[in-house]
């Protein structure tokens, strides 16, 4: 499998970014739910610290992934030729929405922590600077925005997964296979 993208399939690096981010987003969901269920104390703060570290990791991987995608422009697999105009529009809207959320979610979480005067560290190794000053009202705004963005991420992710499954099982094309490390093209 090629490191770089081709017209037929995503390269191994694009796949690694995609699936690593998927795993980290699932981890975020678990960590956020764990933190919600815990009373204020050391366990909750430790869980939130891990949540922030994973969020920063997603932000970094999203930046690398976007850079890789841009550097491969012209080599990325095209959408299936038989897509209708509205399907193309929805595919682009979904992908752009996912990229936007991969940046907006971690950044609003970072701003929320900054406004609450809580540090954002990378697994305790080093501390990131505050993005905004301590401000209770701003903290509440960023918290609401962060939660709204999570809902948007959930909806767009479900649409993305359902579209991939639709292409695989109904359209019987290679849309899903070209993002799977073990996916082979269907016989013509």
Positions of PLM-derived features:
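Membrane-embedded alpha-helical bundles that constitute the cytochrome b-like, heme-associated redox core
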Residues: 1-188
């Amino acid at each position: 499998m090629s490191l770089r993208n081709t017209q037929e399939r995503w390269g191994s690096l694009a796949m690694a970014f995609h699936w690593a981010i998927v795993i980290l987003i699932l981890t975020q969901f678990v960590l956020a739910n764990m933190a919600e269920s815990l009373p204020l104390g050391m366990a909750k703060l430790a869980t939130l610290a891990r949540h922030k570290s994973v969020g920063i990791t997603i932000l970094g991987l999203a930046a690398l992934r976007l850079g890789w995608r841009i550097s491969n422009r012209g080599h990325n697999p095209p959408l299936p030729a038989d897509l209708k105009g509205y399907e193309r529009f929805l595919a682009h809207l979904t992908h752009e929405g996912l990229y936007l959320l991969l940046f907006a979610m971690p950044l609003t979480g970072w701003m929320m922590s900054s406004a609450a005067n809580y540090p954002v560290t990378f697994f305790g190794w080093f501390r990131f600077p505050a993005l905004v000053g301590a401000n209770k009202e701003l903290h509440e705004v960023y918290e609401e925005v962060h939660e709204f963005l999570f809902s948007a991420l959930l909806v767009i992710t479900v649409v993305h997964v359902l579209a991939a499954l639709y292409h695989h099982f109904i359209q019987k094309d290679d849309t899903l296979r070209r993002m799977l490390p073990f996916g082979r093209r269907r016989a013509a």
